[in-house]
Amino acid sequence: MIPAPAIPVQDEAPQEGPPEDGGDAAPESPLSEPAAPSEPTAEARLREREDLDLLFAELAQPGGETWARAETDILRIWSRSGSAAMDLLYKRGEAALDAGDTVTALGHLTALTDHAPDFASGWYLRSVAFYLDGDLGPAIADLGEVLRLEPRHFGALTQLGTMLEELGDDRNALEAFRQSLKIHPHQQEAQDAVRRLEQKLQGTDA
């Protein structure tokens, strides 16, 4: 995961203990949170990238039973921004989505993408929020940011295919699903979509 850029913090000493979850309250400025730990070193980022390469190689294997663990490890790495304050915004946005509160989720996640524009998972989660809010244009734009930062983000490719299919762009939707399956061939949703779209487009190619 590309770490979030360092952000200035207030001079006040951080409070003891973890910050309380804001629930469905209005998003708070990340600058009011306790100072984030120092960013990962270049060596740590390189090691993380090497770990991801190994996990993606394992994920791409069509057989075997270890792909699920590889998927879990990839998602865990992607969920870390490198900043405690940004991670808190991410968790608050995620909690709001789980509660069905897309307005609050978008508030938290917009603050996250503003302060940590290199954190791909922030863009991805905001894309999901836009999609659930019925706003496909911004949702697709956010997926573009995700794929710019992490071209192997299979979740973003599958989500892009879903949105394009809803918009009637079946050919590009099919291509997005196919690209996603090249990275993660075990996604049932993408497999079903490829079969459905190939059958639908078969007649138009005749």
Regions found by a protein language model. Name each.
Residues 56-57, 72, 110, 144, ...:
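Alpha-solenoid helical repeat scaffolds
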Residues 64-67, 102, 136, 170:
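TPR-repeat structural position
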Residues 64, 79-86, 141, 170-175, ...:
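Alpha-helical linker/edge segments of TPR/alpha-solenoid repeat scaffolds
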